[in-house]
Regions:
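Charge-rich, low-hydrophobicity low-complexity segments
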Residues: 1-155, 167-178
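Phosphate-interacting basic helix/loop segments used at nucleotide- and nucleic-acid interfaces
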Residues: 159
Length: 178
């Protein structure tokens, strides 16, 4: 099934260039010199190791769980049932919905959090979001949002609500929990 074709001599590719990589003596294998996320640029023919894992879409149950030793940046949303755990920061450019997010440093949500009383956000540093609705949040330091609705928040230092609305409505909040 199929046609047999004559082999054609290929062209050797030049070795890849990049930061934080070493070329194995076989000149085919590349080894990272540090922990991180591998970035291959086909146009520049380079390979780099970055401390930030950039996810260019949404994280959800179909995408799979994310466990990373550095910082995780999600360019989309974090959907229901998703799990993200990072030793650095977790930065979400969209919103978080009923997910489990933990960070060794800060959690920053450019959009907001609507957890529908499911999931949690936990950070050894601070938690910063546009809004927190029906969320469970544990922060080793401060929590800042424009408004907080019916959420359970524990902050190591302080809870700040800012912006023109600056509302806290319902829920349980505790600050200075270090």
């Amino acid at each position: 099934d199929g046609n047999v074709i004559e082999e054609v001599s290929g062209k050797d590719l030049p070795p890849l260039k990049g930061k934080d990589i070493a070329v194995h003596p076989d000149k085919v294998t590349y080894v990272a010199r540090k922990d991180g996320y591998v970035i291959f640029d086909e146009n520049k023919y380079t390979i780099d190791i970055q401390d930030v894992l950039v996810i260019k879409g949404n994280v959800n149950r179909l995408y799979g769980n994310v466990f990373y030793d550095g910082t995780v940046r999600v360019k989309g949303n974090v959907g229901e049932g998703a799990i993200i755990s990072a030793k650095g920061d977790v930065i979400v450019e969209g919103y978080i919905q009923s997910a489990y997010v933990s960070a060794g440093n800060n959690v920053v949500v450019i959009g907001g959090v609507n957890a529908n009383d499911s999931g949690y956000i936990s950070a050894q540093g601070g938690v910063y979001a546009e809004y927190l609705e029906n969320a469970v949040v544990y922060a080793g330091q401060d929590v800042k949002a424009n408004y907080i609705l019916t959420s359970r928040i524990e902050a190591g230092t302080e809870i700040t609500v800012k912006g023109s609305k600056g509302v806290i409505c319902g829920g349980e909040l505790a600050a200075g929990c270090k």
